[in-house]
Amino acid sequence: MDDAESRFTHLLQPVRDLTKNWEVDVAAQLGEYLEELDQICISFDGGKTTMNFAEAALLIQGSACIYSKKVEYLYSLVYQALDFISNKKRVQQPTSVGADGEDKDATFAHRNDEEEFLSLDDIDSKKTNVDLKKDHILNVVNIVPLTPMALVPPEEVEKKNNPLCSRKGEVLASRKDFRMNTCTPHPSGAFMLELVGKSPMQFLKHIQHQEEVSLTQGEQNAIPEGENDNMESEKSDCADPVQVLQFSDEGAPAVENGDGTGFLPLDDHDEAGDGEVEQAEHIERRKMQIDERGYILRDRVAEQKPTPAIKNETPDPWCVLDPFESCEEKPFKKGKHYTLPRGIAEDLSSNKRKRKLPCKLQDFMKWFSSTHWDGSEAMKSRRKGPTFADMEVLYWKHIKERMTAQRQLHRRMGAQFVKEVTLLNEEEELVDPLEEPRDADCLEYDGPADDASDNEDLGENVPACLREEPALGDIEPVTLQDQLSYEELVRRNVDLFIANSQKYAQETVLSLRVREWEDKMGPQLQEQEEHSAFDIHDYGDRLTAQYSRVGEWHTFASLMADKEPYEVCRYMLASLQLANDYTVEVSQKPGLHEGLDTMALRLLSQQRAHERFKTYTAPSISQQ
């Protein structure tokens, strides 16, 4: 344990010092400090006057309290003086109130006006919002009025039905949190909690009565202005009906009822008769169902379907169809069934084991060649390629497959295959030297690709004995150069042309400047590479060799006559080195402009500097 403490003493010591700081007794320290203050004696005037710290502190505290009291007393005196001055001025001023008690300083604009109270005569008894019954009997218990449904707070479940969300998806409020969604709008723009007074059905009866009067007088779709005014005077402000939003028939025009409010659409007067009788009976039936509050549901407006117009126009077969339009249903018709001919369905993958039929479809190339050229016109030039535009894609596909098969056959057969083919061709030429008509499946080209037509059918002319020899399968390829088709030759030429033209297409302003710089700096750099290496001592020896004796003067221009510019620079550096070694002396004419190109050299010694240092002895050593 002691070993561990001795090893980690430098780590434990700060912790011990920190614990000692918490063991300090503050009271004891203060007591010791006070004792030291009592023992300390500070005297002035040779010991006559002594100083005590406690007395000095009390003296300072007392002087501060006295000073603060003096400041407060001075503050109160200042305010008393100000009050006295203001009261004195007020007493000296004459009073503005006269003997009659009228104040001259005050002005009254409506002094002589009589007091008028708010008149209540303009309130119409018909337009009151309070309905009182004459036979009303006071009950002992007061009935608490029901809270309007518009003021009843909705439940949380109802709020979740139609929430109002922000752009971030946060739920801000609900539809029923706004009064405009729970109250009834008034024509004046206010939102009413509940309808009071007449119901919307009474307004409908009044309009119907006006229509009956207008029918008896022979007027249609019009109401006299007097009756209209009477109707407006009879209506209550709170009983004005609200316009009904029509969602049943949006495209139908608005019906004019003579009032201009558009509360309920009514039928035209021209259609009076059985319809009006039925409507009147329906209204009478609905009257029986009115409750005590006087509210009934309005009749649902019958949806009028527009009669479709008969189209006599001929349909346009090229017109673009509407994807959302309901198409005319057509009966299903059974189509014709076509069977695939034998040979086409053989390539289809099927798990059923079927017997292969011996009959197959005719080869397309044979059929196409026989159709395109029947062999009777052997001497005439034939057209290049197929004559049918629909067969062109299939034709070129078959040609590419044949060319690929020929290349593979050339690689496998090699030189022996070519020898056998040449022998067979020679035998055929000996048998029939005249030109025989070619096979039907042989296609000939008159274009540039006709160079490979001689070896086009090499695979078909190979005898069976050569094909079955196992030795021919081991022959190494690359004995013959593959015959190129016309398309590949064109493709190679185009690629070569593009590669050569890229350097012209990629030339920019920067590349032109770089090329000019290379053309300019290339010869100079090559010339500098051909220069010999610079040896300053060698050039110094050459410069001193041009002097015949010591002390002779020569201008630098005369020494550098017929020298190359780079040689002059090298000799200049060598002359400066010689002047530093005190081998030559450099001088020029005075003046800035006059001293140009007037450098002259005088030879001081023909011995080299390093040779002089070998035989040099210091003056201190030579004197000894």
UniProtKB/Swiss-Prot annotation:
Keyword DNA damage on entry: no
Biased composition (Acidic residues): 442-457
Gene Ontology terms for molecular function: chromatin binding
Location(s), subcellular: Nucleus
The organism's place on the tree of life at top rank: Eukaryota
A cellular-component GO term for this protein: condensin complex
Listed Pfam families: CNDH2_C (PF16858), CNDH2_M (PF16869), CNDH2_N (PF06278)
Residues covered by region (Disordered): 429-457
Record-linked InterPro entries: CNDH2_C (IPR031737), H2_M (IPR031719), H2_N (IPR009378), Ncaph2 (IPR031739)
GO biological process assignments: meiotic chromosome condensation; mitotic sister chromatid separation
Keywords for the protein's UniProt record, in alphabetical order: DNA condensation, Nucleus
Primary location: nucleus
Stated family: Belongs to the CND2 H2 (condensin-2 subunit 2) family.
Subunit structure: Component of the condensin-2 complex, which contains the smc2 and smc4 heterodimer, and three non SMC subunits, ncapg2, ncaph2 and ncapd3 that probably regulate the complex.
Summary of the function given for this chain in its UniProt record: Regulatory subunit of the condensin-2 complex, a complex that seems to provide chromosomes with an additional level of organization and rigidity and in establishing mitotic chromosome architecture.
PANTHER family named among the record's database cross-references: CONDENSIN-2 COMPLEX SUBUNIT H2
Record-given protein name: Condensin-2 complex subunit H2
Organism: Xenopus laevis (African clawed frog)
